Structures are given as structure tokens and as C-alpha cells.
């Protein structure tokens, strides 16, 4: 059994999703939740909350591997910078506990789950619900975190079949 923590980083809310993968490659939902960072004081205090909150979650759920969504350039450079800083704090929380970090772009996650890199959030939420047999509507940040964990599980399974590491299994020749 392998436990994967998926992280959808954000400067206000960070999505957390945890799945277990059995020996047959089947995914099972373990936990999902947002880590709410608003109301934690200035931005540096939010980063501190993210670092400590993820650390506590890692200690509680003991994942074997971590998958995190890469930063994309959004509407403003300032927003992208804050998102990058939140992502950096999340990665620090993971590597401080000697866990491997695997990174996936949003388009790669959408492609892995829905079959097209331009899929919208509702399609991703729907597929996550189906794949993990979840009832009810998922919050976008939780769905994205679970989606990145599922993506890593798929890449991991492909890598094992091919006898390569996960980075080699996902990389494309340009």
C-alpha cells in the first residue's frame, strides 16, 4: 500500500488530498480538506501556518510520496509570486520530512484525469468523484489536490510497468 498526499497550493486556501494505492493499483480516498490561510495575519504568518499545518498533516497521515501542482502564470505577476511562495512553503514542509516531491502542471493533471489538458474545473471535480467513489460536490481546492494525487498514482503505475522512474515516465521528448 502506498499513500500519496496531493497538494494544490494557494496563498489563501491550500487544497489537501490523500489517497491510498493498493498493490493492484486501485485508489482509495483517505482524506481531503482545505488548509485555510486567511485570517492568519500578514502574508508571512500565512506561510508559517501553511508550513506548520502541512507538517502536522504529514505527521498524522504519514504519506509515502507527495505530488504538488506547479505554479501557472495567472492574472497578475503579484498573484503568481504569492502562489509561488506558498508552493515553496509547502515543498519545504515536505522535504523537511524527507519525502519525495513530484510536480505536475495543471494541464498535465487535466490530461491525466479527463483526457484533455484544457478541461474545466467541473470536469476535473466530476472525474475525481467518480474515480474515488465520492458522493456530493467537492470543493475546487480539495478536488485539485486529489486530482494531482491521482495523476501521480497513474504516472507511478506507468513508471513501474516500464521499469523507469516517475520523471522518465512523464517526460516528453521535445
Curated annotation (Swiss-Prot):
Chief place of localization: cytoplasm
Residues annotated for Mg(2+) 1 binding in this entry: 8, 141
Catalytic activity entry: Endonucleolytic cleavage at a junction such as a reciprocal single-stranded crossover between two homologous DNA duplexes (Holliday junction)
Cellular compartment(s): Cytoplasm
Reported cofactor(s): Mg(2+)
Active-site residues (renumbered): 8, 69, 141
Transmembrane segments: none
Keywords: Cytoplasm, DNA damage, DNA recombination, DNA repair, DNA-binding, Endonuclease, Hydrolase, Magnesium, Metal-binding, Nuclease
UniProt-listed SUPFAM superfamilies: Ribonuclease H-like (SSF53098)
Gene Ontology biological process terms from the UniProt entry: DNA recombination; DNA repair
GO MF term set: crossover junction DNA endonuclease activity; DNA binding; magnesium ion binding
The keyword Nuclease belongs to this UniProt entry's keyword annotation: yes
Protein residues bound to Mg(2+) 2: 69
Co-factor binding comment: Binds 2 Mg(2+) ion per subunit.
Cellular component GO terms, alphabetical: cytoplasm; Holliday junction resolvase complex
Highest taxon in the source lineage: Bacteria
Function: The RuvA-RuvB-RuvC complex processes Holliday junction (HJ) DNA during genetic recombination and DNA repair. Endonuclease that resolves HJ intermediates. Cleaves cruciform DNA by making single-stranded nicks across the HJ at symmetrical positions within the homologous arms, yielding a 5'-phosphate and a 3'-hydroxyl group; requires a central core of homology in the junction. The consensus cleavage sequence is 5'-(A/T)TT(C/G)-3'. Cleavage occurs on the 3'-side of the TT dinucleotide at the point of strand exchange.
Subunit relationships: Homodimer which binds Holliday junction (HJ) DNA. The HJ becomes 2-fold symmetrical on binding to RuvC with unstacked arms; it has a different conformation from HJ DNA in complex with RuvA. In the full resolvosome a probable DNA-RuvA(4)-RuvB(12)-RuvC(2) complex forms which resolves the HJ.
NCBIfam families (UniProt xref): ruvC (TIGR00228)
Name used for this protein in its record: Crossover junction endodeoxyribonuclease RuvC
Protein's organism: Xanthomonas oryzae pv. oryzae (strain KACC10331 / KXO85)
Gene name of this polypeptide: ruvC
Amino acid at each position: 500500500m502506498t499513500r500519496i498526499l496531493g497538494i494544490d497550493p494557494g496563498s489563501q486556501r491550500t487544497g489537501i488530498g490523500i489517497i491510498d494505492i493498493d498493490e493492484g493499483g486501485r485508489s482509495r480516498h483517505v482524506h481531503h480538506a482545505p488548509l485555510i490561510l486567511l485570517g492568519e495575519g500578514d502574508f508571512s504568518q500565512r506561510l508559517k501556518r501553511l508550513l506548520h499545518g502541512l507538517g502536522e498533516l504529514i505527521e498524522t497521515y504519514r504519506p509515502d510520496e507527495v505530488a504538488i501542482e506547479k505554479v501557472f502564470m495567472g492574472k497578475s505577476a503579484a498573484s503568481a509570486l504569492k502562489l509561488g511562495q506558498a508552493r515553496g512553503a509547502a515543498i519545504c514542509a515536505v522535504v523537511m520530512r524527507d519525502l519525495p516531491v513530484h510536480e505536475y502542471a495543471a494541464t498535465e493533471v487535466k490530461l491525466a484525469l479527463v483526457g484533455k489538458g484544457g478541461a474545466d474545473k467541473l470536469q476535473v471535480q466530476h472525474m475525481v468523484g467518480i474515480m474515488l467513489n465520492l458522493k456530493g460536490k467537492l470543493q475546487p481546492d480539495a478536488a485539485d489536490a486529489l486530482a494531482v494525487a491521482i495523476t501521480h498514482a497513474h504516472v507511478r503505475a506507468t513508471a513501474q510497468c516500464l521499469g523507469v522512474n516517475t520523471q522518465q515516465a512523464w517526460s516528453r521528448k521535445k
